[in-house]
Amino acid sequence: MDATPELKLYNTLTREKSVFSPIDPNNVRMYVCGPTVYDFAHIGNARPVIVFDVLFRLLRYVYGEDHVTYARNITDVDDKINARALRDHPGLPLNDAIRAVTEKTETQFHADVAELGCLEPNFEPRATDNIVEMTEIIEKLIGNGHAYVASGEVLFDTKSMADYGQLSKRPLDEQQAGARIAVDAHKKNPGDFVLWKLSSHNEPGWESPWGRGRPGWHIECSAMSKRYLGDVFDIHGGGLDLIFPHHENEIAQSRCAHGTEVMANVWMHNGFLQVEGRKMSKSEGNFVTIHELLQTETFGGRKWPGQVLRLAMLMTHYREPIDFSIKRLEEAERLLAKWPAAEASDAAPDESVLNALSDDLNTVAAVQALHALAQAAHGDPTARAVFAATADLLGLLPKKMEIDEAVASAVDALVAMRLEMLKAKNFTEADKIRDELTAKGIQLKDGKDAVTGERVTTWEVKR
């Protein structure tokens, strides 16, 4: 599309922002590391899902919906999964217990990301469906001298690769094993990492040339990206915490197995997330899952719509850290409440928003420009069509809510409850109900009954 500005992306590999030039404009390929399905995804996990969904949407707009391939994996073999299965399902055979954990967690992940307004990737491969592909890569690495067998394990020889460490820029003598599976003392070099590890009788395993075992963490993504995107592809994404060891080791495995100069041309990483100024952790008591945020009153004493969480994430540039807070969610909610409901539109997205997104996904500037469009869209059908197309590009299209009888009854009950709160001068709880309904696109209007003079509240769907 000639009118589309030049897309520039920051590349962690080069530490520079440069013009994006796909290997094949007819098939732009992107791989993003997905969840390990041992526990429900937390709000920090939501950030890469949202960031790379925006990039996916932008690439589809620039190159065409049928010319972009997006793969995001599911890691369903991991020691954390094994431990959770034994804890939650002690009465089941291990494989059945693992399946119960991974299926439940994966189902919840899909429900969560749908609530966040994310498009489905073209491919979402599971690690356990790609064991053969992993063993094939490992055999290649052994055959060309980049891996070795020690006490039944297969390890990658980091000193066999002259420029190992090119992504993280860390000297080899500072590198550590960096595997999720513990490595015993059979390594040639301190930084060597596990490709394949033997499994005991009470651990999941697959037959291989090196005995019954299971893969190391890093080899999974090398195998799945190769299968669905090829030896070399355009973009590899994930969180900043994955640069080392995970992405560094992916590069080493893939390049040495396939004899390529790169694995992916562009490496993109989103920044960290804190909660109310502190690192999110269970010990801090501020660990919040996406499900809890959207479906329970865990955070701020109320439920938050997925669109509010999405906008709250996009109000910070993806490479910057986010301090996640109730205040941030409230700010995003107030902004959304000012936007008109709109149907999907064939209009071209606004140029200022395209310019912002084309500058290394500058969603901060894009959201500011979108808000200006929203103000112009009230009462102007042409402006509203442009607003709708632009909001859709960000996954933020405000849709008019469909109200059925059951939902209407629930709203009526909340409105009645709020009136009782107001009569009791419990304004804090009354405001909570109003804010919750506003976030769902329902606007309240307070007034007085013309006959009795009593306070009454009416409501209508605004989006």
Curated annotation (Swiss-Prot):
Enzyme Commission number(s) from the entry: 6.1.1.16
CDD domains: CysRS_core
Motif 'HIGH' region in this chain: 35-45
Subcellular location: Cytoplasm
Motif ('KMSKS' region): 279-283
Keywords: Aminoacyl-tRNA synthetase, ATP-binding, Cytoplasm, Ligase, Metal-binding, Nucleotide-binding, Protein biosynthesis, Zinc
Family in the record: Belongs to the class-I aminoacyl-tRNA synthetase family.
Assembly with partners or alone: Monomer.
Protein name, as recorded: Cysteine--tRNA ligase
